[in-house]
């Protein structure tokens, strides 16, 4: 998944950008995931609010905006800034850790270790490539490209290449491009492809060739340019749309391809389509109805709370039907 969220271009873009910056600090520096989730949820809710927010009290009426976040909104609206963020930006260690985590492959712990060794900038990283693993070196190599959002038009062209090449190999393959793209987003951070085939189920033996054949085909047509990692069920790499001429090359983009057993495919499609908050709400509703859902299965809960056998699923609609929830099109899941 993409490391960066799109800058907000909504009525309340200043507020949502502030909350996203706070969220990233809590995740990357403080490693306080509960605060990260709280800021992200508030940012997501405010981004969809159809009016310009004039006070923290107004924001607090929205689900997911508590007293502390409302106070920060009041301060931001009154002064145009936030003291906490100013302090974070002025703290060399915090800002360096936050920056390094934007490099694909560098997580918060690795970033802190690098900063402790005095490595704080892209230039520092380039001088110390021997300290980086293969994944991180590729992240550094394409840093500027990976920072750019992928316009929907480009994603549609990328999708055409992937789906056409997959069907050429074997019409029985099923592939879906998930993430915010499937929810109709105007731009994406990366490309997340789910893949399945009738020959691969949760009961059968592993079928890594089903994934590797697709990767090799996409390399053959020069769509996949680099490999970050290639396992039995997941490929992580880099892709690039072919261009008409060398002068107007498309940026390199991150791509993940996951091979999922056919009987678990639609639970996977639902999960990887998101959004995170929509998934949490759906899981909570499922529990109320006596089911447990994850990225693999939906299972009924017995009276003791122990999950039973996975239920058969042949579409996303089946999952909604089991938990008696109105079906929501992917475009209506961006909570």
From Swiss-Prot:
Modification type Omega-N-methylarginine: residues: 83, 152
Catalytic activity annotation: DNA(n) + a 2'-deoxyribonucleoside 5'-triphosphate = DNA(n+1) + diphosphate; a 5'-end 2'-deoxyribose-2'-deoxyribonucleotide-DNA = (2E,4S)-4-hydroxypenten-2-al-5-phosphate + a 5'-end 5'-phospho-2'-deoxyribonucleoside-DNA + H(+); 2'-deoxyribonucleotide-(2'-deoxyribose 5'-phosphate)-2'-deoxyribonucleotide-DNA = a 3'-end 2'-deoxyribonucleotide-(2,3-dehydro-2,3-deoxyribose 5'-phosphate)-DNA + a 5'-end 5'-phospho-2'-deoxyribonucleoside-DNA + H(+)
Region named DNA-binding: 183-192
Organism the protein comes from: Rattus norvegicus
Binding sites annotated in the UniProt record for Na(+) 2: 101, 103, 106
Self-association and partners: Monomer. Binds single-stranded DNA (ssDNA). Interacts with APEX1, LIG1, LIG3, FEN1, PCNA and XRCC1. Interacts with HUWE1/ARF-BP1, STUB1/CHIP and USP47. Interacts with FAM168A.
Source domain of life: Eukaryota
Residues at the active site: 72 (nucleophile)
Family under the similarity heading: Belongs to the DNA polymerase type-X family.
Binding sites annotated in the UniProt record for a 2'-deoxyribonucleoside 5'-triphosphate: 149, 180, 183, 189-190
UniProt keyword annotations, A-Z: Acetylation, Cytoplasm, DNA damage, DNA repair, DNA replication, DNA synthesis, DNA-binding, DNA-directed DNA polymerase, Isopeptide bond, Lyase, Magnesium, Metal-binding, Methylation, Nucleotidyltransferase, Nucleus, Potassium, Sodium, Transferase, Ubl conjugation
GO biological process: apoptotic process; base-excision repair; base-excision repair, gap-filling; DNA damage response; DNA replication; double-strand break repair via nonhomologous end joining; homeostasis of number of cells; immunoglobulin heavy chain V-D-J recombination
UniProt-recorded Gene Ontology molecular function terms: 5'-deoxyribose-5-phosphate lyase activity; class I DNA-(apurinic or apyrimidinic site) endonuclease activity; damaged DNA binding; DNA binding; DNA-directed DNA polymerase activity; enzyme binding; lyase activity; metal ion binding
Name assigned to this protein: DNA polymerase beta
Cross-link Glycyl lysine isopeptide (Lys-Gly) (interchain with G-Cter in ubiquitin), where in sequence: 41, 61, 81
């Amino acid at each position: 998944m993409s490391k960066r969220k799109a800058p907000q271009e909504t009525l309340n873009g200043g507020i949502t950008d502030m909350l996203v910056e706070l969220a990233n600090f809590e995740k990357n520096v403080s490693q306080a995931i509960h605060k990260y989730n709280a800021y992200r949820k508030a940012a997501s809710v405010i981004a969809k609010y159809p009016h310009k927010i004039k006070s923290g009290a107004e924001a607090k009426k929205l689900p997911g905006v508590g007293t502390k976040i409302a106070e920060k909104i009041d301060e931001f609206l009154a002064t145009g800034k936030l003291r906490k963020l100013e302090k974070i930006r002025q703290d060399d260690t915090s800002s360096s850790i936050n920056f390094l985590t934007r490099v694909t492959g560098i997580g918060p712990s690795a970033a802190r270790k690098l900063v402790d060794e005095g490595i704080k900038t892209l230039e520092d990283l380039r001088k110390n490539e021997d300290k980086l693993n293969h994944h991180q070196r590729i992240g550094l190599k394409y840093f500027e490209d990976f920072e750019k959002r992928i316009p929907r038009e480009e994603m549609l062209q990328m999708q055409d290449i992937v789906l056409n090449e997959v069907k050429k190999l074997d019409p029985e393959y099923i592939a879906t491009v998930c993430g915010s793209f499937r929810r109709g987003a105007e731009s994406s951070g990366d490309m997340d492809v789910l893949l399945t085939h009738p020959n691969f189920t949760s009961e059968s033996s592993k079928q890594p060739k089903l994934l590797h054949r697709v990767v090799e085909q996409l390399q053959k047509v020069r769509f996949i340019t680099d490999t970050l990692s290639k396992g039995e069920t997941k490929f992580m790499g880099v892709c690039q749309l072919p261009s008409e001429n060398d002068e107007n090359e498309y940026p390199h983009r991150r791509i993940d391809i996951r091979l999922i057993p056919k009987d678990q495919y639609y639970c996977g499609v639902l999960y990887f389509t998101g959004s995170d908050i929509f998934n949490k709400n759906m899981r909570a509703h499922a529990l109320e109805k006596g089911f447990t859902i994850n990225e693999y299965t939906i299972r009924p809960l017995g009276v003791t709370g122990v999950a039973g056998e996975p239920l058969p699923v042949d579409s996303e609609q089946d999952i909604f039907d089991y938990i008696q929830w109105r079906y929501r099109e992917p475009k209506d899941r961006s909570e």
